């Protein structure tokens, strides 16, 4: 055994290395820093993300007055007169909904004329009823000094006449109320509101009485459709057909405005001012 005391003993080296590796494994199993480091990285990333979103919102609010949406544009007096179907359909469920008249299929002046005609018809019908019941028989009754209750025959003759006249008056009032309800915005659907906006566009931008095809009128009609579809798509994000139609209307409006800009620049400036657009918005609202 003394022969191997100073010699190389590999089995001792192997056992020593094995013991050292076991000690290192035990130390590593006791101290884990990977989860802590990853948690700090995620926390810093979330902080940077929140700061970026906050900064983006601040920039959006700062540019809200200077930069407008290339599709919707700025608010104008004509746009404020348009009826927005989605907002009206939501607001009319409230108890204090304002009563407003519509222009399509008839204006309020036409409705008043219809009501006046009903009043004339009622008056003429009342006169005919009086003649039919032979009111001349009433003149045969005793004078006013004599009480009507003392003459039962006269009371029986006047009572049916009073009932008929009262029924005719109630019927006329119901007809008048029905006409106003039919043409009230509260009982209108979205299609009627869109047609009302179309009629308003023709009245506001027509160059003459029968002008329905000028670029100004067509651009105004497209603008009313764009605003209505934009509100619809914001509340119905899965409506792909509505989004395609919105994109189509935007392209058609830009086409009309570019043509008007080429033909008559003064008319173009007046038109886009009423529509709430600018020259820059028209040129960059469609980039492809």
Curated annotation (Swiss-Prot):
Listed GO cellular component terms?
mitochondrial small ribosomal subunit; mitochondrion
This protein's UniProt keywords: Mitochondrion, Ribonucleoprotein, Ribosomal protein, RNA-binding, rRNA-binding, Transit peptide
Transit peptide boundaries: 1-50
Q: Which domain of life is it from?
A: Eukaryota
In its UniProt record, which GO terms are filed under biological process?
Answer: mitochondrial translation
- Recorded GO MF terms: rRNA binding; structural constituent of ribosome
Q: Which Pfam families match?
A: Ribosomal_S15
Looking at the keywords, is Chloroplast present?
A: no
Q: Where in the cell is it found?
A: Mitochondrion
Assembly, in brief, is:
Component of the mitochondrial small ribosomal subunit (mt-SSU). Mature yeast 74S mitochondrial ribosomes consist of a small (37S) and a large (54S) subunit. The 37S small subunit contains a 15S ribosomal RNA (15S mt-rRNA) and at least 32 different proteins. The 54S large subunit contains a 21S rRNA (21S mt-rRNA) and at least 45 different proteins.
Please state which protein family the record places this protein in.
Belongs to the universal ribosomal protein uS15 family.
Question: Any idea what job this protein has?
Answer: Component of the mitochondrial ribosome (mitoribosome), a dedicated translation machinery responsible for the synthesis of mitochondrial genome-encoded proteins, including at least some of the essential transmembrane subunits of the mitochondrial respiratory chain. The mitoribosomes are attached to the mitochondrial inner membrane and translation products are cotranslationally integrated into the membrane.
Annotated PANTHER family:
RIBOSOMAL PROTEIN S15, BACTERIAL AND ORGANELLAR, SMALL RIBOSOMAL SUBUNIT PROTEIN US15M
HAMAP family per record: Ribosomal_uS15_B (MF_01343_B)
Its recorded name reads Small ribosomal subunit protein uS15m
């Amino acid at each position: 055994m003394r022969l191997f005391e100073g010699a190389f003993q590999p089995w001792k080296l192997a056992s020593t290395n094995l013991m050292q590796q076991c000690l290192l494994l035990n130390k590593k199993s006791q101290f884990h820093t990977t989860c802590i480091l990853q948690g700090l990285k995620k926390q810093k990333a979330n902080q940077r993300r929140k700061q970026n979103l906050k900064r983006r919102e601040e920039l959006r609010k700062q540019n809200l007055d200077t930069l407008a949406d290339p599709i919707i544009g700025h608010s104008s007096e004509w746009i404020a007169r348009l009826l927005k179907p989605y907002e009206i359909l939501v607001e009319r469920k409230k108890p204090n909904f304002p009563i407003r008249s519509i222009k399509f299929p008839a204006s309020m002046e036409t409705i008043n004329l219809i009501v006046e005609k009903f009043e004339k018809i009622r008056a003429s019908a009342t006169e005919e009823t009086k003649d039919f019941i032979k009111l001349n028989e009433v003149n045969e009754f005793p004078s006013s000094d004599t009480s009507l209750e003392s003459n039962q025959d006269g009371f029986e003759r006047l009572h049916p006449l009073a009932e008929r006249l009262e029924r005719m008056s109630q019927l006329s009032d119901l007809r008048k109320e029905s006409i106003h309800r039919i043409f009230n915005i509260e009982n209108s659907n979205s299609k009627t509101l869109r047609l009302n906006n179309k009629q308003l566009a023709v009245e506001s931008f027509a160059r003459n009485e029968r002008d329905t095809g000028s670029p100004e009128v067509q651009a105004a009609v497209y603008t009313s459709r764009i605003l209505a579809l934009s509100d619809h798509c914001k509340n119905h994000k899965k409506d792909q057909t509505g989004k395609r139609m919105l994109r189509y209307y935007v392209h058609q409006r830009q086409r009309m405005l570019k043509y008007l800009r080429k033909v008559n620049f003064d008319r173009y400036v007046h038109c886009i001012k009423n529509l709430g657009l600018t020259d820059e918005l028209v040129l960059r609202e469609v980039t492809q």
